[in-house]
Each structure stands twice: as C-alpha cells, then as structure tokens.
Amino acid sequence: MKRFFSIILLLTFLFMGNTSFAYDESRLPTREDYNKLVEEGVLGESVTYEQFYELQKESLELEEQLGDDWEKITITRANASSYRILGGDIFVTNGTISAGLIGHAGIAINSEEILSTRKGKTPKTESLQYWINNYANSSEKVWLNVYRYKYSTDALKAARWAERTYKGKSARYRIDGDFSTTSYTYCSKIVWQAYRYGIPKTDIGYPPKAAGLYAPISPLKLSHYINPTSLAKAFR
C-alpha cells in the first residue's frame, strides 16, 4: 500500500513539474517584426533578436499564469471606488498597449494617479478608472492585476522617484536594457527603475544578460523582480 501511494505521489509531482500554459505561437515575433521595431526606433539596437524572442515567449507564458491569479483574491469588475490606491502600487495588464511588448505596466505615484508611457508618447498619468475601463475585460480575456510592495514607506519612496523623474518629462519611448538612463524609457522600465533607484539599499533583481547587455523587462514579470510584493487586487 505504501508503495502504491509513493507511486501516486511521484506521478503527481511529475505532472505538476511538466505543467505549462498554452499560448498562441503565432504571436511570437519574427525577424521581420524585430527589424521593423528597430527601424522605427521602438526597440533599441542593443537588444538582439534572440533576447526579444525569449522576452516575448516568456511573456506569453506568464500571460496565462498571471491571468489565473484571480483565484487567489477577490475578483472585481466594478468602478475605482472598490479599491484604494497606495503610492507605489504596481499595475500590470496583458492588454498589448506598449508597442513591442506584451502587456503594459504603471506605478501609482499617489492615491489618484498611475504613471506610465507608451509608443509615440511621453510619460503621463491616468486614473484607476481609466485603467479599469481600458485594461480589464473578461469577455476578451484582458485582465488587470495590482501588486503591492510589502513595505509601504519604501513603496512611497519609489512612487516619489517615479513622479520626480518622469511626470511631465519628455523621455522618449524606447525598449532596451539600458536602465541607467532616463532620457528614453518604456512602461515596465519606469516601474523597475522607481524601485531600484528610489529605495536606498534595495535588492531589486535584474533581467538576464547576453553579450554583457541586459534584456528588456517584461511588464508581466515585474512582480518577479520587485520583491517582496503580493497581489492586492485583480480586475477582470
């Protein structure tokens, strides 16, 4: 009997370990897609095709996984009054808004404004209701997750850094792995930089390197790099 249960347990772990999330492979970028984004200036020349391909592949896998996070918390499809924003809250959606990236991200700089950017634009703020209206639609499988940093005082420092550095500034939109500059940026870079540079002595993770250069950061992987965070709200 013990051997029987041991076999069942082993099979369970093997199944769990091989579980993967299905995604539409036609959404993976071709070299033509990559070259076009580079020519348009949306994607930095330092980003290799291989880095970009892996970034999008990982994002597609995360899209399915994070979309299931609603099981962990109360799901909401109402107005903004159902959630109280705190400075430093991280907003992540699978809505493909930022050209060149799967998903979109923003950071709350106070209790009313969410700072982000997108192709052809400079950083700007929008309300929570705007994000709900545009980035949460269950019928189209578009979801919006809100992640909260464990230490509220530090989260506010990140929010202030983002506001001071990017709100009302003319930073151009460009996706690459150069996190030392604020002259050009993209949605998830703003959030990552806010926590990396806004909090003294923080230990925020970096994306992988290739040939000495960092890969861009996927909006859908921000909660992996910025820790400790937890899912605070899920809008569908």
Where are the predicted features?
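Sec-dependent N-terminal signal peptides of Gram-positive bacterial secreted proteins and lipoproteins
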Residues: 1-23
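N-terminal propeptides/leader regions of secreted preproproteins
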Residues: 19-79
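Activation targets extended, charge/polar-rich intrinsically disordered C-terminal tails
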Residues: 28, 178-236
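Sec-exported extracytoplasmic/periplasmic mature domains
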Residues: 110, 163-167, 192-200
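Intrinsically disordered, low-complexity, charged/polar segments
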Residues: 128-152, 157, 214-229, 233-236
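Internal catalytic-core helix/loop-beta-alpha segment
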Residues: 155-175
